[in-house]
Amino acid sequence: MGAQNTNCTMKFIDIPEDRQREAINTVALQTGLPPSSIEKDWWVTQVLKALHTLPYAEHIAFKGGTSLSKCWNLIARFSEDVDIALSREFLGFSGELSKTQISDRLRRAACSFVREKMQHDVRKALMDLGIRADAFSVDVVITPVTTTDPEVITITFHSLYEVSPYIKNTVKIEISGRSMMEPIEKKAINAAIDAHFSKAPFAEKPFEVNAVIPERTFLEKVFLLHEEFRKSEVRVERMSRHIYDLAMMMDSENKIADRAIHNEALYKAVLEHRRKFIGLKGFNYDELYPATLCIVPNDDIARLWQDDYKFMCEHMIFGQVPSFDELISKLSMLNEQIRQLNYRKA
């Protein structure tokens, strides 16, 4: 994959700015997204393309909410960040690992790789795609902590629009060496601009990425909710997206939710991976087995998340938008369905 030629003769950002705005506005009207989101989608797509032209592209996997929208078309939510799993075998860690190896050596190796090599590789890959060096910058905030995981590469791009606190002119790549790498599938993606103007001189053809299957993402979001609600201080900002994503996957035509929760091997694999590689302090991972799973927020948290969801609906979600009460109702139904499963720890 690393050797594929993904260049075209002209990049979208090379055409006159008035034509860029015109094209962006056309797609914005079609999708219901703000123009700045359409612009940012082009940059998110370029970042993904750059990542999948790296020499070690076979050792990365595209995961998280952005993969649900870009690869699987399961959610009508603009996802602005790119979550990447980096193979721990590629980093030199194979076989069974101790907690010390995970919490120190693996995290340190991933952090070092991102800071010392990957950020520079991404910058070169974007330029190799034909993007002018003055159109973007690449940065990693270097802190004294050398075990940061996930580590973040930030791409800041020149925007046609005034930067807002809701849709920033940055694409964040979150890279983790502790994530699961399997199961994945090859999926072809492209930017909304390219899909709409497929015959234009600047249009780029779809390209393949290594995408985590949505069933795994579904289970990871289920477990994340249970873990979150066990914390003394539950996060609020942009957290309601997880409930929305689960609800959309429950409604999907290809039965993502049913396939996820009834795949006992996958359920246990994701759970046990979180136990070993996430390992929240003081949390009993046996609680994630069906009999004790609790993914519905209490009334106090629900009120806070409802306000967060209102923000998400105004700025990040497009198309038909379910009410927050509908989301909670679906979540309660899902919780009951999972509770009826008889999976047990081996």
Language model features with spans:
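Structured mid-to-C-terminal alpha-helical surface segments
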Residues: 1-60, 72-76, 88-346
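Glycine-rich beta-strand-to-loop/alpha-helix junction loops that act as flexible
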Residues: 62-66
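Betabetaalpha-Me/HNH-type nuclease active-site subdomain
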Residues: 69
